[in-house]
Curated annotation (Swiss-Prot):
Lineage, opening ranks: Eukaryota, Metazoa, Chordata, Craniata, Vertebrata
Protein name: Interferon-inducible double-stranded RNA-dependent protein kinase activator A
Chief location of this protein within or outside the cell: cytoplasm
Region (Disordered): 1-20
GO CC list: cytoplasm; nucleus; perinuclear region of cytoplasm; RISC complex; RISC-loading complex
Domain DRBM: 34-101, 126-194, 240-308
This protein's UniProt keywords: Cytoplasm, Phosphoprotein, Repeat, RNA-binding, RNA-mediated gene silencing
Phosphoserine found at: S18, S167, S246, S287
Domain writeup: Self-association may occur via interactions between DRBM domains as follows: DRBM 1/DRBM 1, DRBM 1/DRBM 2, DRBM 2/DRBM 2 or DRBM 3/DRBM3.
Pfam families per record: dsrm
Protein's organism: Rattus norvegicus (Rat)
GO biological process, one term: skeletal system morphogenesis
């Protein structure tokens, strides 16, 4: 789909020799070129370089829609497509149809250059890219893929991949790691596409729940625990840092994961990482004479970091 607005008649394309060279003849002479390339050549020779701008990007469903506007001289046209390149292609085509004096000339889009997902078999879509665009559109963290299982005989391997997106998780299986990853992404897209438009906002709230604890929200939180942390010294003996961090996490809406490191430190101590699901994610290291001590040290370091962040203005 494309729309155009013709402000003024464009000047004919001048050749370096005598006479004029119409845009229609340029297209006929170079049939292998796309509308974007032809329009760029036209703009270069007339000193009106095409300028493209993205007007709309809708990736809430598994087949995204983009709208691009192109301006060349006094002509402005828009085009829509399921990819940015396809939308630009259609905008350029609409501009060319106005610029050329001849009858409408249609362009065939080379399949390898600009495939239209709506006309492709399902197995040729790019669900991984579509899911990533969906996450970016909503401001979520990017999907994370983990190979969880690999088995089967050498001639018939099967891979299992887990895809995590905020608080959701889907599993995909395939004969290759890439196929398993694609299948997991497809399951996510199918889940989101089955949700009615009026529920998109509530879904965003559910998926984005773990994004609730940001540095901005920490600094401005009226919560009792976080404000107590701002006044605490964090150096008092017999303080249960793990419990204190757990209370703050519950109040501020983030989770804590303690990851024990198998290797001992250079001085022979146990090591641990405390991962906080804040936005951005916080990871703090700890060490001690036991696993418990290492976790407590990691919690202590995390509290010190949160205290610094919360006190900043």
């Amino acid at each position: 789909m494309s729309h155009s607005r013709h402000r003024a008649e464009a000047p004919p394309l001048q050749r370096e020799d005598s006479g004029t060279f119409s845009l229609g003849k340029m297209i006929t002479a170079k049939p292998g070129k796309t509308p974007i390339q032809v329009l760029h050549e036209y703009g270069t020779k007339t000193k009106n370089i095409p300028v493209y701008e993205c007007e709309r990007s809708d990736v809430q469903v598994h087949v995204p829609t983009f709208t691009f506007r192109v301006t060349v001289g006094d002509i402005t046209c828009t085009g829509e497509g399921t990819s940015k390149k396809l939308a630009k292609h259609r905008a350029a085509e609409a501009a060319i149809n106005i610029l050329k004096a001849n009858a409408s000339i249609c362009f065939a889009v080379p399949d390898p250059l600009m495939p239209d997902p709506s006309k492709q078999p399902k197995n040729q879509l790019n669900p991984i890219g579509s899911l990533q665009e969906l996450a970016i559109h909503h401001g979520w963290r990017l999907p994370e893929y983990t190979l969880s299982q690999e088995g089967g005989p050498a001639h018939k391997r099967e891979y299992t991949t887990i895809c995590r997106l905020e608080s959701f998780m889907e599993t995909g299986k395939g004969a290759s790691k890439k196929q398993a990853k694609r299948n997991a992404a497809e399951k996510f897209l199918a889940k989101f596409s089955n949700i009615s438009p009026e529920n998109h906002i509530s879904l965003t709230n559910v998926v984005g729940h773990s994004l609730g604890c940001t540095w901005h929200s920490l600094r401005n939180s009226p919560g009792e625990k976080i404000n107590l942390l701002k006044r605490s010294l964090l150096s008092l003996p017999n303080t249960d840092y793990i419990q204190l961090l757990s209370e703050i996490a519950k109040e501020q809406g983030f989770s804590i994961t303690y990851l024990d490191i198998e290797e001992l430190s250079a001085n022979g101590q146990y090591q641990c990482l405390a991962e906080l699901s804040t936005s951005p994610i916080t990871v703090c290291h700890g060490s001690g004479i036991s696993c418990g001590n290492a976790q407590s040290d990691a919690a202590h370091n995390a509290l010190q970091y949160l205290k610094i962040i919360a006190e900043r203005k």
